[in-house]
């Protein structure tokens, strides 16, 4: 009987880990496709704006407002060649030294480093593309995108909302997270590796190997124990997000991940 129980438990553990790894990989691809769609929105509008003799024409400003109203961009900005940015809400700022603007003026579609908000504790990025007129770059078009909301949306229907997601740089800095506070005590800027280095690893992977996976953008999964008892066991699945060398992770109690196999346990 003990042998049978061991066999079933191993079966459940193996298949739960496979499901975790597969789900995180699929959601990473989904996230990248969503961002590519929004790059498509920007490029389409930028092409239209480039047809105007005046980059700040009334028609272009109307397109700017419409872009913000009809997409998931929270803010949009039309930027002149000198770095003066005109936002959909009427604000005017200078972004001449921002990396995303400088790269867009070189003809690249760019993604900014994460911008943390002290107001709503969420992380945003700027997507930016060049505006061309007769093959000459005359400005840039950008939109701010909430990656915390994106991360949350991706995993809303997985495992009955149990667990939480993280977006982490390859160096281990947490730049976005979601989920119920009861599941975690983390904040922006925390080091993913420091958080987990003193926890008990129940899988073959070591934290050193996880660091190597992050650096190389490889998929992986670890099983850890955060406390002294089995009830604290967690799976952490991770994969490359496909932008800015970031990784996306999903953390869930083992008991929740294995719920679908409860009929076998009983």
Where are these regions (language model features)?
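Extracytoplasmic/periplasmic ligand-binding sensor regions of membrane-associated signaling proteins
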Residues: 70-72, 81-157, 161-164, 169
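Juxtamembrane extracytoplasmic/periplasmic/luminal helical "stalk" adjacent to the first N-terminal
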Residues: 1-55
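Extracellular/periplasmic juxtamembrane segments that couple receptor/chemosensory ectodomains to their
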Residues: 196-265
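Extracytoplasmic/periplasmic sensor domains and loops in membrane signaling proteins
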Residues: 61-63, 88-117, 182-225
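Short beta->alpha transition motifs characteristic of CBS
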Residues: 89-92, 145-147, 176-182, 254
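Short hydrophobic/aromatic beta-strand element in the GNAT-like acyltransferase core
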Residues: 75, 128, 235
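Short N-terminal helix-loop-first-beta-strand/juxtamembrane motif that initiates sensory/input modules
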Residues: 37-43, 65-85, 108-109, 156-182, ...
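Short glycine-/small-residue motifs
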Residues: 140, 177, 247
């Amino acid at each position: 009987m003990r042998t049978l129980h061991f066999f079933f438990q191993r079966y459940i553990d193996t298949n739960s880990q496979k499901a975790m790894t597969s789900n995180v990989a699929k959601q990473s691809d989904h996230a990248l496709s969503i961002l590519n769609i929004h790059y498509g929105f920007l490029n389409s509008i930028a092409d239209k704006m480039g047809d105007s003799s005046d980059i700040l024409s009334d028609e272009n400003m109307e397109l700017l407002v419409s872009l913000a109203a009809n997409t998931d961009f929270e803010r949009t900005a039309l930027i002149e060649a000198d770095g003066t940015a005109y936002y959909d809400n009427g604000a005017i700022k200078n972004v001449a030294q921002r990396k995303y603007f400088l790269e867009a003026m070189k003809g690249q579609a760019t993604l900014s480093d994460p911008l943390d908000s002290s107001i709503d504790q969420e992380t945003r990025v700027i997507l930016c593309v060049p505006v061309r007129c007769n093959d000459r770059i005359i400005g840039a078009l950008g939109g701010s995108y909430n990656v915390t909301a994106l991360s949350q949306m991706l995993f809303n229907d997985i495992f009955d909302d149990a667990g939480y997601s993280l977006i982490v740089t390859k160096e281990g800095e947490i730049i976005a997270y979601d989920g119920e506070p009861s599941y975690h005590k983390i904040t922006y800027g925390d080091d993913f590796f420091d958080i987990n280095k003193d926890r008990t690893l129940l899988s073959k992977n070591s934290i050193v190997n996880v660091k190597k996976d992050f650096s190389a953008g490889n998929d992986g999964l670890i099983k850890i124990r955060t406390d002294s008892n089995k009830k604290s066991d967690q799976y952490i699945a991770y994969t490359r997000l496909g932008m800015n060398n970031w990784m996306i992770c999903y953390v869930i109690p083992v008991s929740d991940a294995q719920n679908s196999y409860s009929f076998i346990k009983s």
